[in-house]
Amino acid sequence: MKIKICGLTREEDVVLADSLGADLLGFIHARRSPRHLELGDVAELSSLIPDEKAVLVTETSETSRIMEAIDKTGIERIQLHSVSPETAGKIHESLHAEGYSLELTLAVPPLSSHICGHEFQGISGLILDSASGGRTGGTGKIIPPSDALELLALIRGMDPSLRVTLAGGLTLEFVRKNREYVSKFDCLDFNSGIETGPGVKDHEMMAELMNYIEGLPTRKGAIEEI
């Protein structure tokens, strides 16, 4: 099981997340987000960590803008937000020859309607995030475990090779109380649950989280295939 720290906006938080052993570090380029960063800032912060750890979160559906973001940041792992599976497939067709990694965020709910009839062509992973009040993620709300498990089973049945990440308001307390449940996922995505304010990570919470995670049996070998 891998750990992703997302919504990073400060140099000191990036450096700490990397040093604590987080596998993936996410930088958000979406203007509606309180953690939005301009591409120049993303490039500066992501330069502090190994290339394979950086993830660029974007909600644009325009391939040209995605290519611009890749060119300006140097990040080759892209997380698509507020984009349909069909659109993600078209983006993949445009980027495939370049060898970039695409992951797609699914807002929960709705549930099975997200994936029925879709093949997720070219998508290497899916991120389950909570939807609320018209927002398709970034709500800071926990996904009901029954909903997430329903989607996980459907995804596993369709394509066992797809990496499935659980996001949505995750905290250390929740992980401790639901250890068996969260261990079913390939990756856990932490953002608001380890913050004192939007984009401001709590260093004590981060350290406590990573210390706990490193002791889990499912954590063994997590970095072997990022």
Curated annotation (Swiss-Prot):
Superkingdom of this protein's organism: Archaea
Signal peptide: none
Catalytic activity: N-(5-phospho-beta-D-ribosyl)anthranilate = 1-(2-carboxyphenylamino)-1-deoxy-D-ribulose 5-phosphate
Name of the protein in question: N-(5'-phosphoribosyl)anthranilate isomerase
GO molecular function (one): phosphoribosylanthranilate isomerase activity
InterPro entries hit by this protein: Aldolase_TIM, PRAI_dom, RibuloseP-bd_barrel, TrpF_fam
Keyword Isomerase assigned: yes
Coiled-coil positions: none
Pathway: Amino-acid biosynthesis; L-tryptophan biosynthesis; L-tryptophan from chorismate: step 3/5
EC number: 5.3.1.24
EC top class, as a word: isomerase
Intrachain S-S bonds: none
GO terms (BP aspect): L-tryptophan biosynthetic process
Similarity comment: Belongs to the TrpF family.
UniProt KW keywords: Amino-acid biosynthesis, Aromatic amino acid biosynthesis, Isomerase, Tryptophan biosynthesis
CDD domains: PRAI
